[in-house]
């Protein structure tokens, strides 16, 4: 059986980490694409030279032409400008929208059957634009947000409770930005909901509120520490988990930015929701009950994403 083909559009810090993880997990052969000559070729060769040490078989190809992604099973898009200190994800809008237009055209021409995962920020608006520019069906184009945001929430909770991250489940809905909605009621430690753990005296509501805010600020915290770039290890690991669920038809329940068609009262927009990811892409969108406060937060998050999409249309009217 032929190996799967994974195309990575953008060979920066996330792109290189994606390639390494795809190799380590033997998900398939990898094509690294970038407009910077030498960068994808150099990273590809470097990772390939690690394969005898780590014991994995995969071919790594660096390219500066979209033709190299032809027939890819999965395309992961990281191309664009990363955040710098003081920048919000939204500041990147104008620059990265132009990048999505070029990437969408490349995918449409060379990999129209692929499952596409977008990581470029501002995430919810960029994946929405990418789906329109590429013309791919919405269930085959998703944004990586919720897996990362939930992972941050889970890690902070595991630290607070001094338990294994494996025993913590966490739920984050909404846009990938300051308005994201971490849901304490649906988050658990070994099946015990967080509100119950507060009642049991494991933590206080004040501490939990601070963890929720730290989750919202998770990306900015790393940008502030690194000073010259943004997070790349956890975002890459999150996208690989999504790609693996698709390639292996695992049907994982993963929070991703998916196009909604009436669920949660939202239409024709990409927002972070729990989904089932399998061989057909987004196979199910899970619509959970939200209480009044959660719904208000979610609606605020949706309004924020809608504003970004409107701004995109202002820059590129063809998106309307």
Swiss-Prot record:
Which segments does the entry list as coiled coil?
none
- In this chain, NAD(+) is annotated as bound at 10-15, 34, 96, 119-121
EC number(s): the record gives 1.1.1.37
One Gene Ontology term from the biological process aspect of the record: tricarboxylic acid cycle
Which GO terms of the molecular function aspect are on file?
A: L-lactate dehydrogenase activity; L-malate dehydrogenase (NAD+) activity
Catalysed reaction equations from the record: (S)-malate + NAD(+) = oxaloacetate + NADH + H(+)
- The active site is formed by 176
Q: Which controlled-vocabulary keywords does the entry list?
A: NAD, Oxidoreductase, Tricarboxylic acid cycle
EC class of the enzyme, as a word: oxidoreductase
Which Pfam families does this UniProt record tie to the protein?
A: Ldh_1_C, Ldh_1_N
The record lists substrate as bound by 83, 89, 121, 152
Superkingdom of the organism of origin:
Bacteria
Instruction: Write out the function statement from the record.
Output: Catalyzes the reversible oxidation of malate to oxaloacetate.
Q: Which PANTHER family does the UniProt record give? A: L-2-HYDROXYCARBOXYLATE DEHYDROGENASE (NAD(P)(+)), L-LACTATE DEHYDROGENASE
Its family?
Belongs to the LDH/MDH superfamily. MDH type 3 family.
What NCBIfam families does the database record attribute to this sequence? MalateDH_bact (TIGR01763), PRK06223.1 (NF004863)
Descriptive protein name: Malate dehydrogenase
């Amino acid at each position: 059986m032929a190996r799967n083909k994974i195309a990575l559009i953008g060979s920066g810090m996330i792109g290189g980490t994606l390639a390494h993880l795809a190799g380590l997990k033997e998900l398939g052969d990898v094509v690294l694409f970038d407009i910077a000559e030498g960068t994808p070729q150099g990273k590809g060769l470097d990772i390939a030279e690690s394969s005898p040490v780590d014991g994995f078989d995969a071919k790594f190809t660096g390219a500066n032409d979209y033709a190299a992604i032809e027939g890819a099973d999965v395309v992961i898009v990281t191309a664009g400008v990363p955040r710098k200190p003081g920048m919000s994800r939204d500041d990147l809008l104008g620059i990265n929208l132009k990048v999505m237009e070029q990437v969408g055209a490349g995918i449409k021409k060379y990999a129209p059957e692929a499952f596409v995962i977008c990581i470029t920020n501002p995430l919810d608006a960029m994946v929405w634009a990418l789906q329109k520019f590429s013309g791919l069906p919405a269930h085959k184009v998703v944004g990586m947000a919720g897996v990362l945001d939930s992972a941050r929430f889970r890690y902070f909770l595991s630290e607070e409770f001094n338990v294994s991250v494996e025993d913590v489940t966490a739920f984050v809905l909404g846009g990938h930005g300051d308005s994201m909605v971490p849901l304490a009621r649906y988050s658990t430690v070994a099946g015990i909901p967080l509100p119950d753990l507060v009642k049991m005296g494991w933590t206080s509501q004040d501490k939990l509120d601070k963890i929720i805010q730290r989750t919202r600020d998770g990306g900015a915290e790393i940008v502030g520490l690194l000073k010259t770039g943004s997070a790349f290890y956890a975002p890459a690991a999150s996208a690989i988990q999504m790609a693996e669920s698709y390639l292996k038809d695992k049907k994982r329940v993963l929070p991703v930015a998916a196009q909604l068609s009436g669920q949660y009262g939202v239409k024709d927009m990409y927002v972070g929701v729990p989904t089932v990811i399998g061989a057909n892409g987004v196979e199910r969108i899970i619509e959970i009950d939200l209480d009044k406060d959660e719904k208000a937060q979610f609606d605020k998050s949706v309004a924020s994403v809608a504003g970004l999409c409107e701004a995109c249309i202002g820059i590129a009217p063809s998106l309307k």
